[in-house]
From Swiss-Prot:
Chain positions recorded as NADPH binding sites: 10-11, 31-32, 105, 140, 255, 279, 281
Family under the similarity heading: Belongs to the NAD-dependent glycerol-3-phosphate dehydrogenase family.
Protein name in the entry: Glycerol-3-phosphate dehydrogenase [NAD(P)+]
Cytoplasm recorded as keyword: yes
Catalytic residues (positions): 191 (proton acceptor)
EC number: 1.1.1.94
Native species: Chlorobium phaeobacteroides (strain DSM 266 / SMG 266 / 2430)
Superkingdom, taxonomy of origin: Bacteria
GO cellular component: cytosol
InterPro entries noted in UniProt: 6-PGluconate_DH-like_C_sf, 6PGD_dom2, G3P_DH_NAD-dep, G3P_DH_NAD-dep_C, G3P_DH_NAD-dep_N, NAD(P)-bd_dom_sf
């Protein structure tokens, strides 16, 4: 199969290499022509994935439109807030028979839409059955080294999900399938916010009890939002829910956890973001999900606390006290 991958960050590059190693012909698109030329010349992504060599059947291109036209499958691996402008580059192309696989984890800030909703809005000829999302606990740093990883491919069409499964599945990259794309995308977005909160507990010096509380109650927030928006409750207990939540909250590779640690240690958000090499999706997603939760009437106190600390400059200790001193509730509501 010929597959285009849009986005040459660590995850896009990792998936491009994985797909090429499986035998697919892969076109990896980089936004800046000079970066694309450097990747093609170096045969590795020194900036984002140093040490991982490109197979011969992986080529780096600077024209996304041409790559899409010539491919059967398109993987979108750009930051969630850049998805709309990226796919607009090929919105006039015929997408008949093509499958679009989103691997970004976020909610669009200006619209409150999930990634598959953005794709369907920007690409008017695309049908929902042509769209899939690949998600789960899958840090690029481990996948690129061939370490065991499990993810889920989700689409409203089981047939499409199974095509994606076949395209990506390897001996060390196990792909499951489901048809709950709503739940998979919402869970993938919310877990980044909860990871920031988990990082904050580290940064202020709290122990494992606090982190476990954040993960567990964060899962409850994720579940409430997913159910309110029509997702399958079982999805939250799967790879895209608890699986990705745990790894993002605990892993040393987690950019969102890192942001939280630094916030907890007293650094400003602007200072943290300005010194990061890659995007922490949970930052802007916290604002998008907070606004979404209010619009649909779902209580998400941890998400609200993260939003207030990041965007309203609420002191960390004050936010923690407010969380702990909320009115007592039933565990499940």
């Amino acid at each position: 199969m010929k597959i285009a991958v849009s986005g040459a960050g660590s995850w896009g590059t990792t998936l491009a290499v994985l797909l090429a190693n499986k035998g697919h012909e892969v076109l990896l698109w980089a936004h800046r022509p000079e970066f694309a030329a450097a990747l093609e010349s170096d045969r590795e992504n020194i900036r984002y994935l140093k040490g991982v060599r490109f197979p011969e059947n992986l080529h780096v291109v600077s024209s996304l439109r041409d790559a899409v036209i010539s491919s059967e499958m398109v993987v979108t691996a750009v930051p969630s807030q850049a998805l709309r402008e990226t796919v607009a580059m090929f919105s006039d192309c015929s997408l008949d028979g093509k499958i679009i696989v989103n691997v970004s984890k976020g909610i669009e800030l200006k619209s409150g839409k999930r990634m598959s909703e953005v794709l369907l809005e920007v690409l008017p000829t695309l049908h929902a059955s042509q769209v899939a999302t690949l998600s789960g606990p899958s840090h690029a740093e481990e996948v690129s080294k061939g370490q065991p990883t499990t993810v889920v491919a989700s689409s409203v069409s089981m047939g499409t999900a199974e095509i994606v499964q076949e395209a990506f599945h390897t001996g060390m990259f196990r792909v499951y399938v489901n048809t709950d794309i709503i739940g998979v995308e919402l869970a993938g977005a919310v877990k980044n916010i909860i990871a920031i909160a988990a990082g904050i507990t580290e940064g202020v010096g709290f122990g494992d009890n606090a982190k476990a509380a954040i993960i567990t109650r964060g899962l409850a927030e994720m579940s409430r939002l997913c159910i309110r928006l029509g997702a399958d409750p079982h999805t939250v207990s799967g790879l895209s829910g608890i699986g990705d939540l745990v790894v993002t909250c605990l892993s040393r590779h987690s950019r969102n956890r890192y942001v939280g640690e630094q916030i907890g240690a007293g650094r400003s958000l602007d200072d943290i973001v300005s010194q990061m090499n890659m995007v922490a999706e949970g930052v802007l997603t916290s604002k998008a999900v907070f606004e979404l939760s209010r619009s649909v009437g779902v209580e998400m106190p941890i998400t609200q606390a993260v939003y207030e600390m990041l965007f309203e400059h609420k002191p960390v200790q004050e936010a923690i006290l407010d969380l702990m001193n909320r009115e007592p509730k039933k565990e499940h509501y």
